[in-house]
């Protein structure tokens, strides 16, 4: 992967998604995507290694063909499972006037990772809240400033269970690619919020296949995150049981006729389903179906409210932002709006080819990767002269200004620590050919970004640090 291309992998419970993108002015230009449905993932974690590996491999291949990029290095998304979020600080001293650069920022953040003393967990992301130069000058990005005495950082930290981390990376790297870094969904969700939402206090609700993830942001920063083992699969199970039909039929009916808000569902939209205990077919209306869907989605939202209460979060002045595959259901916004007084919106990525809520996590991982690289001066992006339309990019300006950092990159210096069903994203042949043509044009017009040393495989470094 050339430095100006970013490849993200989102291993979800229903499918694996890969996006190839690049920084493009104030947004991300999506060059190619891949999606493969799989039964090898349960609750966001590896359930069957071989099945999951094949799905990941197939998805990478699809994205490579669509983008024309030979994918060798990737950024991996991690779920909010087995995750802890907390605050920490660290300070480094200077003994002469020093111009602060990316290596100094990396060093002060590295010290935070080393402070982790919770067994069986590993710090994966550190996101600076503020930097303090010479004990009194608070800044968001200290690069190029002169420090006479010290650089301090006050930061949020995301740690995850080591077993989850190791198995996810191992499965991806078994596909012949290197994991350059990992980013928690708790961290990634910041890029789908507006500056106002993050400042006032916003709750992201990502309703996936097996897991619903919750993250709360306030005053511009991640406050806490958690997950609920209730999501889209439970909705389908309820439909199958309520309509006395198979799970597969219930899934199709959910996507074709599903509505999460009973009051808005139609009693004129009629469909038939086969019964599991007879050869008969029975007719139902969308309103009949909505009765089952609304009850389960409502229960999911009540579980979210319980999570917020358990975290001590009682005000959501910035509103609720719902995303994930199950956010595709009609009526989700109306139902939640009926349950709360705060603003509610459904988040869908803006780029062509990924305009579905289930791609929010994958594109957000690229946003995190760009913010991380620019904070540490790993790359210097030379922008295209070409003009882009608003629909082709997603704004990452807020993410850049936050100066967040993903911390798993620090593993490369860590040593001696003791301790099959597939389906491609819909795209026409014309879009694929156009992507390949665009790739050739990018290669001609792009100036290469600054080179950095070839990194050894994250998984190999991690295994060395854990078992040597």
UniProtKB/Swiss-Prot annotation:
Q: Where is the composition biased (Acidic residues)?
A: 425-434
Identify its membrane topology class: Peripheral membrane protein
**Keywords of this entry:** Cell cycle, Cell division, Cell membrane, Membrane
The compartments listed are: Cell membrane
Q: What do the Gene Ontology cellular component annotations say?
A: cell division site; cytoplasmic side of plasma membrane
Q: Where is this region: Disordered?
A: 416-468
Show the InterPro entries listed in the entry: ATPase_NBD, Cell_div_FtsA, FtsA/MreB, SHS2_FtsA
* Biological process, per Gene Ontology: FtsZ-dependent cytokinesis
Pfam families associated with the record? FtsA, SHS2_FTSA
**Which segments show compositional bias classed as Basic and acidic residues?**
436-459
SUPFAM superfamilies named among the record's database cross-references: Actin-like ATPase domain
Source domain of life: Bacteria
Q: Does the keyword Cell division apply?
A: yes
- Primary localisation category: membrane
- Keyword check for Cell membrane, yes or no: yes
Q: Which family does it belong to?
A: Belongs to the FtsA/MreB family.
* HAMAP family, sorted: FtsA
The subunit field of the Swiss-Prot or TrEMBL record says: Self-interacts. Interacts with FtsZ.
Report the protein's function: Cell division protein that is involved in the assembly of the Z ring. May serve as a membrane anchor for the Z ring.
| NCBIfam families reported for this sequence | ftsA
Q: Any idea what this protein is called?
A: Cell division protein FtsA
Organism in which the protein naturally occurs: Staphylococcus aureus (strain MRSA252)
């Amino acid at each position: 992967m050339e430095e100006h291309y970013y490849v993200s992998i989102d291993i979800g419970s229903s499918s694996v998604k890969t996006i190839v993108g690049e920084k493009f002015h104030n947004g991300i230009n999506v060059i190619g995507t891949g999606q493969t449905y799989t039964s090898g993932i349960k609750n966001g974690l590896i359930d069957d290694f071989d099945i999951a590996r094949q799905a990941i491999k197939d998805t990478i291949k699809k994205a490579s063909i669509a983008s024309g990029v030979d994918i060798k290095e990737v950024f991996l998304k991690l779920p909010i499972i087995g995750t802890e979020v907390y605050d920490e600080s660290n300070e480094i001293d200077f003994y002469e006037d020093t111009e602060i650069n990316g290596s100094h920022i990396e060093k002060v953040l590295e010290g935070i990772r080393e402070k982790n003393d919770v067994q069986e967990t590993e710090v994966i992301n550190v996101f600076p809240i503020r930097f303090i130069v010479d004990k009194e000058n608070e800044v968001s990005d200290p690069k190029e400033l002169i420090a006479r005495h010290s650089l301090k950082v006050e930061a949020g930290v995301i740690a995850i269970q080591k077993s989850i981390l190791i198995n996810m990376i191992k499965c991806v790297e078994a596909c012949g690619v290197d994991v350059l870094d990992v980013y928690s969904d708790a961290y990634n969700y910041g890029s789908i919020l507006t500056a106002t939402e993050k400042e006032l206090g916003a709750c992201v609700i990502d309703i996936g296949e097996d897991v619903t993830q919750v993250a709360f942001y306030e005053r511009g920063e991640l406050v806490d995150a958690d997950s609920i083992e209730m999501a889209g699969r439970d909705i389908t199970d309820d439909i199958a049981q309520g309509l006395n039909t198979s799970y597969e039929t219930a899934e199709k009916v959910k996507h074709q006729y599903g509505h999460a808000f009973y009051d808005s569902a139609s009693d004129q939209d009629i469909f038939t389903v086969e019964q599991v205990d007879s050869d008969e077919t029975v007719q139902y209306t969308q309103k009949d179906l909505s009765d089952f869907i609304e009850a389960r989605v409502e229960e999911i939202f009540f579980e979210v409210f319980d999570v917020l209460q358990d975290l001590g979060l009682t005000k959501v002045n910035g509103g609720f932002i719902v995303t994930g595959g199950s956010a595709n259901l009609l009526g989700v916004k109306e139902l939640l709006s009926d349950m709360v007084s705060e603003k509610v919106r459904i988040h869908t990525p803006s780029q062509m080819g990924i305009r579905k809520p289930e791609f929010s996590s994958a594109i957000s991982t690229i946003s995190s990767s760009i913010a991380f690289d620019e904070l540490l001066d790993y790359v210097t992006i030379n922008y295209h002269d070409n003009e882009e339309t608003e629909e082709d990019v997603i704004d990452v300006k807020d993410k850049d200004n936050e100066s967040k950092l993903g911390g798993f990159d620090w593993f490369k210096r860590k040593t001696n620590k003791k301790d099959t069903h597939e389906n491609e994203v819909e795209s026409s042949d014309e879009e694929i050919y156009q992507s390949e043509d665009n790739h050739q044009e990018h290669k001609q017009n792009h100036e290469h970004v600054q080179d950095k040393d070839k990194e050894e495989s994250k998984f190999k470094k991690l295994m060395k640090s854990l078992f040597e």
